[in-house]
Amino acid sequence: HADWNIIKQVKENVSIPVIGNGDVTSCFLAKKMLDETGCDAVMIGRGLLGNPWLVRECVDYLRDGTLPKEVSYKEKIAMMRRHYKLLCEDTNEVSASLEIRSHVLYYLKGMPKSKEMKNKICQCKNAQEIFSILDEYEHYLEGLIV
């Protein structure tokens, strides 16, 4: 657990900008950190895992109070695909297939059959297999919503 009191104490005792960090998982917590500590900015780490939309949500909320919209399962699956493609560009399919495994549960948190999906993706060795599993899952979710 992050101790925001330490951030506040540092801010009160230095004349340089202070960036707060720790346990920020929503735009509301980013605002709370700014208000409670007086820090000049907020840095987000683990809160972004599986939730890259959090940056946009924080900017919008802090700028004009815009409340975050729920991210749809389609957006989450599209982002997993994009994330995987970027990993492939940065390394190769085999390395990307191994790396994406550590991110899947974060993206799928709170979604039906998330553990089963992670297990399936952990068996994949290339893009074709991963995209096929994601297509299957998206089709499954469409059936639940109709």
Task: Give residue spans per PLM region.
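Alpha/beta catalytic cores of nucleotide-metabolism and tRNA/nucleoside-modifying enzymes
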Residues: 2-20, 24-146
